[in-house]
Structures are given as structure tokens and as C-alpha cells.
Amino acid sequence: MSQARPVRVTVLIDTYNCGHFIEEAIDSVLTQDFPPEQMEILVVDDGSVDDTTDRIRKYGDRIQYFYKSNGGQASALNLGIARAEGEIVAFLDGDDYWLPGKLQSIASEFEKNPETGMVYHNFFYKREPSQDLKTAEGLAGFSGFLPDIRNGLLNYDLYPTATLAFRRSVLQRLLPIPECLVVQADAHLSACVVFIAPIAYIDKHLTVYRVHPGNLWNWGGNTPSDVNILEGDPAARARMKRRVITTREIGIGVGRWLEKNGFDVNRPDVRAFLMQWTLSSNAAEFALTPPGRLRFFGHLLDQSRYAGTRMTWRHKVVHYANAFGSLFVGYRNFHLLDAGRLATKRSLRSMLGRS
């Protein structure tokens, strides 16, 4: 009986002005305990003007390096995927890095089920310049065909680029990524793939996601404290404006892809799945321009309505009560009161010895 052919993996690193991080990213791939003959490394440079090129040249023919004019992450990923030859394509941003065992873990997961379209996993994050690794809280991981899992679409969280790997034959059905997505372009892929193939989640920390000043997604952006930060930082305001636009464009792009491929976008869970980008975009916009009471009330009402199918009746009562309460206290006071409530809840749980 013949043995199965070893899986071949393309590691696709997209980068832009990450010269001070890129070597750590590449080295984290080269030091993986994975046969080199089963791996190719592609670096797509989206027009860096720092020393990225010089740093990458040191690696010689171990790296396939593609330099292009600046067009955003979607254009970089589209180019890289078109050049990929592996059966599996694993992503890595130039400012993040992998941990030992990453490649072998995802390759094994794909080999378990030939139908699996995407494998993703848990991760650490670190805030520069600190070396402390922390775990993101409140994120869910799923395995299976998401539309068949009760509330699967509503509870599905999108993970960072460096945690994602796709079967190339499935990935090609999701292309092209809309090139208006200059950042977080992989969200289009991980949002669409769940409708055409099962996914698999590995509950291991196999990647480090780096948070630094140039990172667009480095805070929540939907509380009064964020408003105060943005008011004194023009560069941060510019990044947040781009975040608002990009988040909306992701939702629009996913909706168009679903309609083009014959999916029912009016199915309640699909409609709620798409609505999350509008709600997230609105929340980020509020950090730029705090909303009036009526608009904030409408936002909270939409949150309650579209998340309602995954709530218990008690949660629904609380959410709707909060929405109507916002009419009396307004945006800033609502978040201050909510922060106080959560702090009190954490203190009580700590006193009772609960995690």
C-alpha cells in the first residue's frame, strides 16, 4: 500500500515598511520543524521604503521575494496567492511571527480531513516594546461546517492574519480579494470560506501578534477613553478613519461574494453575520465623532436585534433595557456606567473565588 504524498505548504508573508520586524518573521518560519523540501516561502513587499529589501536579500534563494508598488494588503495577497504552488497556503504578516510547531500542526490538521478549507489557531499578542505575551480573551474557535452549527455564524470570530492557513483549491474560489481592502484583507477570506468548506480550529498558541503604533487594529475604538486618545493624536485619528472605512468595505465585499455565489443573504443568521461589520464600523466611528442619543440608541437596538438569536431571554431583557437607558444617559455616561458595572462584577467574582 503506497503512502500518502507529503503535503506541500506555501508560506505567504506580506509586508510593508516592517524592516525592523521582518527578519524575526522569516526566521520563525525557517526554524520550523518541517521538511524544507515541502515548503516554499514567498515574501510580497507592498512598496516598502525602509530597509526591508536589504534585510530580505540576506536570505538568498531560500526566499522568493516580490516587490510591488504600494496598493494595500489585498493586492499583495492576491499577487502572492497567484504565485503559490503549495497545496496549503499559510499567511504571516511581516510584523508578526510564528512559534515552534506551527507548520506541523496545521499540516497535520489538513491531512486529517481532505474537505477542510481553513485551519486556524489560538495566538498570543504582545504590545511593543513589552516582551510579555498575553492571550486574547473572549474569542471563540470552531471546527466543522459553520452554517450547520447552531449559532455558529453569530459566534464566529475573525482571527489575525498569522493564524490562518487555507487549502489552495478552496482559496482560489474566494478570489480575488477586493483590492479596496488596504488592510485586514484576509478577513474577506476567513469570512467567506465558512460558507463553502469545513474549518478546523487548533486550541494551541502558535503565533505572536504584535501590537505597535503603526498597527491599525491596536485598540477597541468604541469607548469614551478612545475618544480622548484620538482627540490628541492626528495620526491615530487617520488610522481610525481608515478602520471605519475598511470595516464597512469588508462587510460589503462579503455580501457581494455571497450573492454572486448564490447564497441566501436574507437568511436570519447570514443577515446578522453581515450586520456585524456595520455595527463594528459604527462603534469605531463613534470614537471619532461621539453620537447623539438617538443614534446611539438605534445602534444598541440593532446590536440587541441581530445578536438576539444567541441570547438567553435574560440577556435580551438586559440588552434592550440598556438600549432604552442610553436615551437618558447618552454615549459617554453609558460607557462609564457600563465600565463600573463590569469592574464591580469582576471584583465580586474575585471575592467569591471564581475565574
State the predicted function of each range.
Residues E37-G47, F66-S69, G94:
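Short beta-strand/loop segment that forms part of the nucleotide-sugar
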